[in-house]
From Swiss-Prot:
This is O-methyltransferase penC. One of its GO terms (molecular function) is O-methyltransferase activity. Its EC number is 2.1.1.-. InterPro entries: COMT-like, O_MeTrfase_dom, SAM-dependent_MTases_sf, WH-like_DNA-bd_sf, WH_DNA-bd_sf. Pathway: Secondary metabolite biosynthesis; Alkaloid biosynthesis; Mycotoxin biosynthesis. Belongs to the class I-like SAM-binding methyltransferase superfamily. Cation-independent O-methyltransferase family. The keyword Nucleotidyltransferase does not apply.
Length: 398
């Protein structure tokens, strides 16, 4: 079957035939490649049957979808539809306290965006996407993005025009600073706002969405557990926030070894029942050498994509100083952008990383170059089966 960039040039009838050919494979929930192909072909089919001018004009109005969804989240509309659907506009107005006319207009757009189902005039029911939108972790992401990412993106035309149309590399002179009129870095700005930090942490705990978690596909036994020194830390989660990864690891591999999560004091929070199994260490990964020496694995989950190359090099060099050659492994859990045929999520995440802190999503070659500069060598690059999913770059000290 033809996939990738070639598929967008096929005639609609050919694309429909390819979708039909996928039907037997889609019955197998474990055939992730079939799902990826189905999504790619479906998007290509949509682009072929829509009028080009309509697509171009709709794009100009597309920001209203996310912004209206943010209002719907503030009014708790998705949760109300899940709880009471099918539910009419009058009931939603009474339950939310908003004007009924506003409810009708917002929900009309949510329906056309397939976030809810319009089952009758001024009446909506929940779909599986509605249920996702009603989750607090996802609502937190929408709140955070509308306060930080959206203003930064809106400022992009002026910012790039004034800065010679080049990628930002100074974390104090980027799009967030330009848009929000602050001299703080994006992360300092977030930390200084408690409600924003809470939303950020909640959202990051759900950053994988429905994509497979790395513990489900990475060979933990052979790559981490086998040959591990019980006298040394097993995993150090660098910049690990509230410990999401290590909590999941402990649940799947209880008592496997010493687990350490590191982050800034303002980010670390009590781990409750897991505090007996996971150590917390205050550490700024930009400040210098890694404090936990000779661990089996140093995990960086969505760290590199937040930073320009020069900052990543500082982080990697600090970790490399603590690694034991031939034993310690560095695991970079990141989106790995293909040289051709990137999916929507990969491209969107790349631009988001750039506008937030001058970061980027990287290709295999970019990871090779970056790690080599830090005195590290790529052992293997593990790619997720999910569409737009993360991979893991496994590296060791040269």
């Amino acid at each position: 079957m033809t996939v990738g960039s070639q598929v967008v040039h096929d005639e609609p009838t050919i694309l429909i035939a390819k979708l039909h050919a996928l039907e037997p494979r889609l019955k197998d929930k474990n055939d992730h490649q079939a799902r990826k192909e189905c999504l790619r072909i479906s998007k290509a089919l949509t682009s072929q049957v829509e009028e080009p001018d309509n697509v171009a004009v709709s794009l100009a109005f597309s920001p209203v979808i996310a912004l209206s969804a943010r209002v719907a989240i503030d009014l708790n509309l998705f949760a109300l539809v899940v709880q009471h659907g099918p539910v009419a506009s009058a009931s939603l107005a009474a339950l939310s306290g908003a004007e009924e006319l506003l409810i009708i207009r917002i929900m009309r757009l949510m329906s056309t965006a397939h976030l809810v189902e319009e089952t009758a005039a001024r009446t909506w029911s929940a779909t599986r996407i509605t249920k996702a939108m009603a989750r607090e972790e996802i609502a937190a992401g929408h709140r955070f993005n509308s306060q930080v990412v959206v203003p930064a993106i809106q400022s992009a035309p002026d910012f790039f025009r004034e800065n010679g149309y080049s990628c930002p590399t100074d974390t104090r002179k980027g799009l967030v600073q330009y848009a929000l009129k602050t001299e703080q870095t994006a992360f300092d700005y977030i930390i200084s706002n408690p409600s924003m930090l809470k939303d950020f942490n909640l959202f990051m705990g759900n950053a994988m969405g429905a994509r497979k978690f790395w513990l489900d596909w990475f060979p933990v036994q052979s790559k981490i557990l086998d040959g591990a020194d019980p006298e040394k830390a097993l995993i150090v989660d660098v910049g690990g926030g509230r410990g999401h990864d290590l909590i999941a690891f402990h649940k799947q591999f209880p008592n496997a070894g010493r687990l350490v999560v590191e982050d800034l004091p303002a980010v670390l929070e009590p781990l409750g029942e897991f505090s007996a199994f996971i150590e917390q260490v205050e550490h700024d990964f930009l400040s210098g050498e890694q404090p936990v020496k000779g661990a089996r694995a140093y995990l960086c989950h969505h760290i590199m994509h937040d930073w320009p190359d020069s900052y990543c090099l500082r982080i990697l060099e600090g970790i490399a100083l603590a690694m034991t050659p031939g034993y310690s492994k560095l695991l970079l859990h990141e989106i790995i952008v293909p040289e051709q045929g990137a999916c929507d999520f990969q491209a969107q995440s790349d631009i988001t990383a750039m506008v937030c802190n001058g970061g980027m999503e990287r290709t295999k070659q970019q990871f090779h170059t970056l790690l080599k500069a830090a005195g590290l060598s790529v052992v293997q690059i593990w790619e997720s089966a999910d569409e737009g999913g993360d991979g893991i770059v496994e590296a060791m000290k040269v």
